[in-house]
Amino acid sequence: MQIVTSPSELRALRREWKGTVGFVPTMGALHKGHLTLIQKSKAQNEKSIVSIFVNPTQFGENEDFAHYPRKPEADANICQKAGVDILFMPKAEDIYFEGDEVLLKAPQKSGFVLEGAARPGHFDGVLRVVLKLLHLTSPTRAYFGQKDTQQLLLIQKMARELFLPYEIVPCPTERDSDGLALSSRNAYLSEAEKKEALKISASLKEATKHIMTGELQSSQIKERALKVLEGVEVEYFEIVDRNLMPLERIIKGETIILVTARVGKVRLLDNLWI
């Protein structure tokens, strides 16, 4: 495995490869969910690139950029054992130029609801860095987890509308044995908070149970699910279509249920595709 920090070195190495290339962009603090993406890339491509970059432009002023977990040595070891070909670990000054003027704006509707409403400017930063990383790595396929559903859908939209020649591959959410969606931020949780956080996935199970028994009215499903979340600080629990617009009734094959809540100081996301 080669560890690369320079965009020019990455592009030079990439030009030497003629076969299929998979790309897994991450912010580090790698866990089993990331490893699943890497394994999928390895299985579907001749070469695989992983990036680790805590992107400053997707964090707001009062968010946890400075405290986001960083484990470069452990992450490099995980990538080495997984058979990654190139680990790209740039610094902010390698990705962004002083006085950058060519910016990217998230879609006015789907980019400023849900996470976009809670974190203004977040998806501008996400799309900007993902586009840069895709151009630097020129992958055949790029892998993104469904846990960050809104991010995934917006990246797919960007790829489609900008005619990017890269396949965006969605990958199912990985969970621990209790059902908690894996996240780098789980490291912040105490044992008591981890138990409390299980209410998040439990609320999705509750919603599924009622849908399976024939309840299709979104308001009724939401009401029942929110009872499971009592005691947790819920930011939103929404039932939307694939364009992230609200649905009054469940449409199987077109519905996503998204929940975001705070447990202690930790903000956690989860979702269910129906």
Curated annotation (Swiss-Prot):
Q: In which pathway does it act?
A: Cofactor biosynthesis; (R)-pantothenate biosynthesis; (R)-pantothenate from (R)-pantoate and beta-alanine: step 1/1
Localization, per the record, is: Cytoplasm
Binding, ATP: 27-34, 145-148, 182-185
Keywords from UniProt, A to Z, are: ATP-binding, Cytoplasm, Ligase, Nucleotide-binding, Pantothenate biosynthesis
Question: Which reaction does this chain catalyze?
Answer: (R)-pantoate + beta-alanine + ATP = (R)-pantothenate + AMP + diphosphate + H(+)
Q: Which residues form the active site?
A: H34 (proton donor)
Name the Gene Ontology molecular function terms of this record. ATP binding; pantoate-beta-alanine ligase activity
Q: Name one GO cellular component term.
A: cytosol
The record ties this protein, via InterPro entries, to: Cyt_trans-like, Pantoate_ligase, Pantoate_ligase_C, Rossmann-like_a/b/a_fold
**Class of enzymatic activity (EC top level):** ligase
Which CDD domains does this entry report, sorted A to Z?
PanC
What residues does beta-alanine bind to?
Answer: Q58
Q: Which Gene3D superfamilies match?
A: HUPs (3.40.50.620), Pantoate-beta-alanine ligase, C-terminal domain (3.30.1300.10)
- Location (main, coarse): cytoplasm
Q: What is its EC number?
A: 6.3.2.1
Q: What biological processes does GO assign it?
A: pantothenate biosynthetic process
Q: What else is known?
A: The reaction proceeds by a bi uni uni bi ping pong mechanism.
Q: How does it assemble?
A: Homodimer.
**Which family is it part of?**
Belongs to the pantothenate synthetase family.
Q: What does this protein do?
A: Catalyzes the condensation of pantoate with beta-alanine in an ATP-dependent reaction via a pantoyl-adenylate intermediate.
- Protein name, entry field: Pantothenate synthetase
What broad taxonomic lineage does this protein's source fall under? Answer: Bacteria, Pseudomonadati, Campylobacterota, Epsilonproteobacteria, Campylobacterales
